[in-house]
A protein has these predicted regions:
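Short, Gly/Pro- and small/polar-rich lid/capping loops
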Residues: 1-30, 35-43
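Active-site- and interface-proximal helix/loop "cap" or "latch" segments in soluble metabolic
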Residues: 22, 38-187
Length: 187
């Protein structure tokens, strides 16, 4: 596996972690949970926040859960601000209930950035929606494909342009993965 080249001498200042996990529920629905944390390596006074933060204590700690059906329709949403710089940051959490009824599909990330821009949302929870959406696709699509294959059904992409074709360098038209996955359509 390739690695980055050796770094110059340096010291860590800030770490942002985003972790997302996809789940298959027993009732036939799907869930994706995402969590974002920002941690600094130095003590922060109350200049930019409502209270001081010790080194290693999260400045931001937010979680998001989306519940989806097989068509990627969001049927439930929950956002929680566990820790934030300002005491009223969690006042925006219920705004993310507006995700219910939206579908994760092409244009989703731009749509949520528009819907939750500025004072209509939390920058960090909104930033979490992109990785959560990707995790939904990465979790659910393979399971739906496996189920179709077990039933002997053809892939839904057969005969038409697959949504993933030309979505990135690896899935570019004419690439080995595209040809293997989609045959003539991938050429």
């Amino acid at each position: 596996m390739k690695e980055l080249s050796p770094a110059a001498p340096r010291r860590a200042l800030h770490t942002r972690k985003i972790e997302c996990t996809g789940y298959e529920r027993d009732d036939g629905l799907w869930e994706v949970e995402g969590r974002l944390s920002d941690v600094r390596t130095w003590n922060q006074g109350n200049v930019n926040s409502s209270r001081p933060r010790a080194a290693g204590e999260p400045i931001h700690l937010m979680s998001l859960r989306l519940t989806l059906d097989d068509s990627f329709l969001i049927v439930a949403a929950e956002a929680v601000t566990h820790q934030a710089p300002f005491v009223d940051c969690d006042g925006i959490n219920d705004s993310y209930l507006q995700l219910v009824g939206m579908r994760i599909q092409a244009g989703f990330t731009q749509a949520v950035k528009t819907r939750f821009r500025g004072v209509q949302g939390c920058t960090h929870i909104t930033d979490l929606l992109g990785p959560v959406a990707t995790t939904a696709l990465q979790s659910i699509n393979p399971q739906l494909s496996r189920r179709r294959a077990e039933r002997g059904e053809p892939p839904p992409d057969e005969g038409r342009r697959p949504p993933m074709l030309d979505s990135c360098h690896g899935w570019r038209r004419g690439s080995e993965p595209a040809i293997i996955r989609w045959g003539k359509v991938g050429r």
